[in-house]
Amino acid sequence: MKSRFLLYFLLIPILLSAQPYAVRQLGIEKGLSNNYVVSIAQDKEGFLWFATEEGLNKFDGTRFITYYKNEIRNGYGITGNELNCLLDDPKDSILWIGTQRAGLNAYDYVNDTFTFYRHNEAAPESIITDDVTNIVAADDGNLWVTTYWKGIEYFDKETGHFFHYNTATVPGLASDNIWTVADGGNGKLYIGHVHHGFSILSIKDKKVRNFVHDPNNRNSLPGNEVRCVYKDMNHNIWVGTNKGLALFNPESENFIQFNSDGNLSHYIYD
């Protein structure tokens, strides 16, 4: 789902337009499984998907179809009802689903089948933990999967193997509590921590640079809880924190803060 600060900018042309727009509310009375919606995605067939605290929902423009744990579809079902994130695969007809405590799920919406990836102590190539906070497309077509307790996973879709990037494998990484990442497409991974600021990881050699808020430096990170990181079409890196929005300049390694004029909420998240 696009970050709220991006929606703010996208809504400006709508607000300036004279065209009337109708807003429809879609809640449990319309068939949504739960009103606490944590993530939204649109698939390649045009359907909207809503992840909630109580199941997965597909909306066809008229009605909702719900997907719950223990509902078997062609052999398997979704592994948990408490969800955190969705990603429509950039290449394949797959909806990726991150759960709070039940691993990573892949839903093939053409063939109506689920595949799941859970932590397995006996398999070091399995996902390192079942608590998934975000799923992001990697520059090479694979996936980055962030977790709340065990760092970042790189998922090779062809082999089904996970490669672990955490404080045990990346010396100097600020923490293993990760909200999100963005693939810079330049061999660098931009990382948002739960409490420990912002990091830049050189994927090949695993060198890392960490950035935290400095109250004496107006060009530092606004806040240390980084909920969203976004690379725009001009390769700018936008960072959403608990204390406002910032634009990161990779050349100077400074942040331009957008948190003082009252136009944006200080808490930026996706």
Model-derived features: where do they sit?
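Carboxylate-rich, polar loop motifs that coordinate divalent cations or form catalytic acidic clusters
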Residues: 1-270
